[in-house]
């Protein structure tokens, strides 16, 4: 069988959405996600979640993860360009992603640490200032 052992780079699943958690580069993370999606996994072992079973479940996961990566990137850019502080941007992301299962198993301190790296990466890679 085609089993993919994922890392947080491919998203942290909260039961409804795959939150992007990227520490090295947002563009690089998006490329990794697209490559992993193209593998046609039948099972994915997700950090902080467990196993997703079935080709269709895996396809849906990657579809959702790609959507959430794009949503996060676009909103961080928009919020930054409108003058919102990094702290406030991180709080908006917390409200969207640190809920449900993720809120129960993913320590808040880790979420703040990781998004505290990711938000400036997005701004650096996509914003002119």
Residue spans for each PLM region:
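Broad hydrophobic/π-residue packing in well-ordered secondary structure
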Residues: 5, 29, 45, 68, ...
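Feature marks short, surface-exposed loop/turn motifs that line or immediately flank catalytic pockets
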Residues: 13, 53, 97
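Charge-dense, low-complexity intrinsically disordered segments
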Residues: 19, 23, 59, 63-66, ...
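Catalytic core of the metallo-beta-lactamase
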Residues: 1-31, 35-38
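Membrane-targeting and insertion segments and their boundary/processing signals
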Residues: 3-7, 46-50, 93
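Divalent-metal (often Zn2+) His-rich catalytic cores of metallo-beta-lactamase-fold enzymes
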Residues: 28-82
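C-terminal regulatory/interaction regions
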Residues: 78-129
């Amino acid at each position: 069988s085609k089993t993919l052992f994922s890392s947080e780079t491919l998203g942290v699943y909260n039961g409804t959405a795959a939150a992007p958690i990227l520490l090295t580069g947002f563009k690089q993370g998006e490329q990794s996600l697209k490559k992993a999606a193209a593998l046609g996994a039948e099972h994915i072992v997700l950090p902080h979640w467990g196993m997703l079973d079935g080709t269709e479940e895996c396809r849906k996961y990657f579809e959702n993860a790609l959507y959430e990566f794009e949503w996060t990137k676009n909103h961080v850019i928009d919020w930054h360009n409108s003058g919102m502080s990094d702290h406030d941007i991180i709080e908006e992301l917390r409200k969207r992603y640190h809920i449900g299962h993720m809120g129960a198993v993913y320590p808040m301190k880790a979420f703040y640490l990781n998004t505290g790296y990711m938000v400036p990466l997005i701004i650096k890679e996509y914003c002119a200032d």
